[in-house]
């Protein structure tokens, strides 16, 4: 996906020149895939450009969405993106670390594309450190925040690189969460998996796990988008 100053979707535009993390395909898949349809209140942890909040607001036309972002420049740009969208009256942004975020409400659903690549070398640029690494939000802190902010029967949807996702799932299980839905994302069929999308619920209220068929962005030619990918993103991507 091109790293342009802005990215146009069917119902909104995401400006991203002030954000370390640009619009990327895997985040778009999370926004289209996450279990949000029946939620009244949704929390987006690590809002970045506001992409996930905007996608969720388009999919769920009545939910109230709170979005938390620690980086000042990303927070202000997300605010501009939200304000210029059709969903500005249902999305509220907070400039805060989620560890310090206090809400009057608990949430039906949490969605997050958290800092990752815990085992990679740190970038020398602080903004990229925040966006790419769990230095600002490790697994335990994230799970503690979710435990505090999610309703007892709530669900959280999360995106990770494959290795990080497997480690996170182990941590979550030890903390009393059950993986109830999983999607493995590939660039194309002959490539290695590169992302895990997961939904968790508290073990005492959880349903049986749904392991969905692998999703490929492209067909084997590496150019043509896979039909299932097109179907998932057709409400958002202009070219679909």
Swiss-Prot record:
Q: Which reaction does it catalyse?
A: adenosine(37) in tRNA1(Val) + S-adenosyl-L-methionine = N(6)-methyladenosine(37) in tRNA1(Val) + S-adenosyl-L-homocysteine + H(+)
Q: Which Pfam families match?
A: MTS
Q: Which Gene3D superfamilies match?
A: Vaccinia Virus protein VP39
Q: What is its EC number?
A: 2.1.1.223
Query: What InterPro entries does this protein's entry cite?
Result: DNA_methylase_N6_adenine_CS, rRNA_Ade_Mease_Trfase_CS, SAM-dependent_MTases_sf, Small_mtfrase_dom, tRNA_Adenine-N(6)_MTase, tRNA_adenine-N6_MeTrfase
Q: Which UniProt keywords apply?
A: Cytoplasm, Methyltransferase, S-adenosyl-L-methionine, Transferase, tRNA processing
Q: Provide a GO CC annotation, any one.
A: cytoplasm
Give the chief site where it resides.
Answer: cytoplasm
Where is this protein localized, as stated in its record? Cytoplasm
Query: Carries keyword Cytoplasm?
Result: yes
Q: Output the Gene Ontology terms for molecular function.
A: nucleic acid binding; rRNA (adenine-N6,N6-)-dimethyltransferase activity; tRNA (adenine-N6)-methyltransferase activity
Which one GO biological process term can you cite for this protein?
A: tRNA processing
Q: What does the function comment of this entry state?
A: Specifically methylates the adenine in position 37 of tRNA(1)(Val) (anticodon cmo5UAC).
The Swiss-Prot or TrEMBL record describes its family as follows: Belongs to the methyltransferase superfamily. tRNA (adenine-N(6)-)-methyltransferase family.
Protein name according to UniProt: tRNA1(Val) (adenine(37)-N6)-methyltransferase
Species whose genome carries this gene? Dyadobacter fermentans (strain ATCC 700827 / DSM 18053 / CIP 107007 / KCTC 52180 / NS114)
């Amino acid at each position: 996906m091109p790293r342009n100053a802005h990215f146009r979707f069917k119902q909104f535009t995401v400006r991203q020149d002030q954000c370390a993390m640009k619009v990327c395909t895997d985040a778009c898949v999370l926004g289209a895939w996450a279990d949000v349809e029946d939620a009244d209140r949704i929390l987006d942890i690590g809002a970045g450009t506001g992409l996930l909040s905007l996608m969720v607001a388009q999919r769920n036309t009545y939910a109230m969405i709170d979005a938390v972002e620690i980086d000042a420049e990303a927070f202000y740009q997300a605010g501009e993106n939200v304000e210029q969208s059709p969903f500005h009256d249902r999305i509220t942004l907070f400039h805060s670390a989620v560890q310090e975020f206090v809400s009057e409400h608990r949430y039906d659903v949490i969605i997050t594309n958290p800092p990752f690549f815990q085992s990679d070398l740190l970038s020398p640029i602080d903004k990229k450190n925040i966006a790419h690494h769990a230095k600002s939000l490790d697994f335990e802190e994230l799970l503690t925040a979710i435990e505090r902010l999610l309703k007892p029967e709530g669900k959280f949807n999360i995106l990770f690189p494959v290795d990080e996702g497997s480690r996170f799932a182990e941590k979550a299980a030890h903390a009393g969460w059950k993986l109830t839905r999983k999607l493995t994302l590939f660039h194309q069929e002959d490539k290695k998996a590169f992302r895990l999308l997961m939904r968790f619920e508290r073990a005492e209220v959880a349903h049986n796990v749904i392991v969905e068929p692998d999703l490929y962005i492209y067909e084997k030619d590496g150019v043509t988008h896979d039909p299932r990918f097109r179907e998932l993103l057709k409400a958002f991507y202009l070219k679909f």
